[in-house]
Amino acid sequence: MTIIVDYRFPPAINAEKQAKTIAIGQTAGTWSERHSHRQEQLQQHLGEVVGIREEADGYKVARVRFPQINVENDIASLLTMIFGKYSMAGAGKVVGVYLPETYGTKAKVGITGIRQRLGVYDRPLVMAIFKPALGLSAQDHADILREVAFAGLDVIKDDEIMADLPVAPTHERLDCCRLVLEEVRQQTGRNVLYAVNVTGKADELQRKARLLVKHGANALLLNVLTYGFSVLEALASDPAIDVPIFAHPAFAGAMCAGSDTGLAYSVVLGTMMAHAGADAVLYPAAYGSLPFDPQEEGKIRDILRDRNVFPVPSAGIRPGIVPQVLGDYGRNVILNAGTGIMDHPSGPASGVRAFFEALARIEAGDSFDPANLPEGALKQAILEWG
C-alpha cells in the first residue's frame, strides 16, 4: 500500500526538481551508482513523483507516492518521512496527504458514540468553555457548570490554557464538577460532558488520563500539537481511557500559517488528527474571530466526518451566526462558544439559551432580524454581537 502527498511550490521554484529531491531524499536518501548492488533492496523503499500540475496562479502541485512500508502506522514516523528535514529546505508546502483507511488510530467514540452518550441525535451539540480561562477556583468551575448545564448545555471544556495549577488543580476541578454532573443527571435525566484538560510531562500524561477517567472524567481535552500526536495515539489506544478525546489546535499556526511553508491546516487538523484517534477536533471558523480560509475549513470538516470525528468550529462562535454554521455544516457539528456564552449580557445560562433559541428559529424558518425577534436571550446576543 502507498501514501500520497501533495506539495505546493511557488512559481520561482523548480517543482519537478524539488519533488524528485523529496521522493529520493525522504526515502532511500540517495540513488547513485555506488548503491547499484542494492538496487532491488532499495527500490521497494523509494518514493516516486507521479504527477505535477500547474494552478492558475502559477504555483505547481507535485504529487509524490511513498511506500507505506517506510513508516510505522503512526503520525510521528509519517511526518518525518513526508516532510522531516525537507521542511527546512525553503519554499514548499504540504497541502494534501492521502492515507489508507486502515492507517493510524481510529476514533474510539467519535460522532456516533458522543451522541449516544448524550442521548442527542437530531440537532447540533452546544458546547461552552470555562471563562475566565485562569483565576477561577475549582468551586468556581462547578458553579459555572451548574448554571450552564441546567440551561441545557451538552458539553463544556477547560480552556486549553488551564493546566494543573495550584489555583484549581485538575483533580479538584473534576471532583467539584463531577458532583454537578451527577446532580444534573438526577434532576433532568440528561448527561453533560466535561472535557478535562490533560497536561504534564510525557511520562505522566497517560497515567494522569487513566486516573481522571477512573475518578469520573467523562471526556478529555488534549493540546495535541504541543504534547505530540504520539500522546493522542497512546490515549486513544488505551482501553482504560474509554471517553471521548477533544483535540485542541493550539500551536497549529506555527506549523500551518506560512503561505509557502509548513503544512496545510487541513493536513494537520484534518488528516493527522483523524488518523491519530481524536474523537472531536476544534479549529477556527472562517466567520469567527481568527482569520481562517473557508476552503481549508471545509476540507477539515469533510476529512473529520469521513472518519466519524466531530468537527468543532470555534473562536468567535456566537448565536447570531448559527444560521451560517448550519448552512455549512448541517446538524453534525458541535457549536463551541467561549465568550459567546460566558459573556452574554444576562449571564452564561442566557448564553446557552440563546443558542437553543437560534436552533429553534432555524428549525421553524424564522427570521434573525432583531426587529422580528421576541425579547429574550437570542435578541440580547444579536444586539450585543450581531
UniProtKB/Swiss-Prot annotation:
Annotated binding of substrate, by residue: 131, 157-160, 248, 316, 338-339
Enzyme class per UniProt: isomerase
Chemical reaction(s) catalysed: 5-methylsulfanyl-2,3-dioxopentyl phosphate = 2-hydroxy-5-methylsulfanyl-3-oxopent-1-enyl phosphate
EC number: 5.3.2.5
UniProt cross-references to Pfam families, sorted A to Z: RuBisCO_large, RuBisCO_large_N
GO terms (BP aspect): carbon fixation; L-methionine salvage from methylthioadenosine
Stored InterPro entries: Diketo-Methiopentyl-P_enolase, RuBisCO, RuBisCO_lsu_C, RuBisCO_lsu_C_sf, RuBisCO_lsu_fd_N, RuBisCO_lsu_N_sf
Pathway(s) it belongs to: Amino-acid biosynthesis; L-methionine biosynthesis via salvage pathway; L-methionine from S-methyl-5-thio-alpha-D-ribose 1-phosphate: step 3/6
Quaternary data: Homodimer.
Note: Has no RuBP-carboxylation activity.
Record's protein name: 2,3-diketo-5-methylthiopentyl-1-phosphate enolase
Organism the protein comes from: Microcystis aeruginosa (strain NIES-843 / IAM M-2473)
